[in-house]
Amino acid sequence: GRGNSIKHLRHENIISLLDVFISPGEDIYFITELLGTDLHRLLSSRPLERQFVQYFLYQMLRALKFVHPAGVVHRDLKPSNILINENCDLKICDFGLARLQDPQMTGYVSTRYYRAPEIMLTWQEYDSAVDIWSVGCIFAEMIDGRPIFPGKDHVHQLTVITELLGSPPEDVINTITSENTRRFVDALPKREKIPFQQRFPNASEEEIDLLEKMLDFNPKERITAADAIQHPYLAPYHDPSDEPVANERFDWSFNDADLPVDQWKVMMYTEILITSEF
């Protein structure tokens, strides 16, 4: 039943919903494990040492390696929903809640920096590759200390991406269904890719190699979580016997429904009732 989604998303690198209750005013409260800080706060206070960059990236990919085969996509990964405690344990929060939030409220700006280009170019079905893009942006920010693609708005967002990656490849342009978007992309100045080594002079060859595979313009060419976690850069942490994969797909189709918020409350409530029986 609907209880699937939360019940089966139990993983060390994902925040578990420990308890949920609905107040008399029918607000939904998610009581989650509390972790010390988030990556956004951590990055704004000081540059990260290399071993932390590595370990944090590993844990993010470990979470995605688990959920992606189940057909679950976060869609809104950014440093502020990556929680970290004093032992450097990392957990991703807000899985499956991205659609519940009102875009006006979520501080669209911070989110935009981490949005995959295909979301802006097509607005149609997109898949787990969008999470890999977001984690690639977060990886770059951990290396460099500042956001890699700080777009001021939708249009500027694509411009800053092309300034580093060069013009979108043909196979990406061919997926664009909207004529307006197509015209916009055709009007962008033709750009060559800038070598990542030039943009990130302090990064190691292994870091650069993995980063380029994660920030591929074409979602179909972009590396998967399962492949990224096996990259030599993450060898110190990679342990196939300790990287579980969700063993069944579950249906979050209700998550795509465009429902008024009061209906969401009822739905979430039923989901939670079912979940709490386990």
From Swiss-Prot:
A motif (TXY) lies at residues 106-108. GO terms for cellular component: cytoplasm; nucleus. Residues 1-234 form the Protein kinase domain. Keywords: Activator, ATP-binding, Cytoplasm, Kinase, Nucleotide-binding, Nucleus, Phosphoprotein, Serine/threonine-protein kinase, Transcription, Transcription regulation, Transferase. Its main location: cytoplasm. GO terms for molecular function: ATP binding; MAP kinase activity; protein serine kinase activity. Pfam families: Pkinase (PF00069). Its EC number is 2.7.11.24. It comes from the Eukaryota. The modification Phosphotyrosine is found at Y108. The modification Phosphothreonine is found at T106. It is found in: Cytoplasm; Nucleus. SMART domains: S_TKc. It catalyses: L-seryl-[protein] + ATP = O-phospho-L-seryl-[protein] + ADP + H(+); L-threonyl-[protein] + ATP = O-phospho-L-threonyl-[protein] + ADP + H(+). Belongs to the protein kinase superfamily. Ser/Thr protein kinase family. MAP kinase subfamily. HOG1 sub-subfamily. PANTHER family: MITOGEN-ACTIVATED PROTEIN KINASE. The TXY motif contains the threonine and tyrosine residues whose phosphorylation activates the MAP kinases. This is Mitogen-activated protein kinase HOG1. The gene is HOG1.
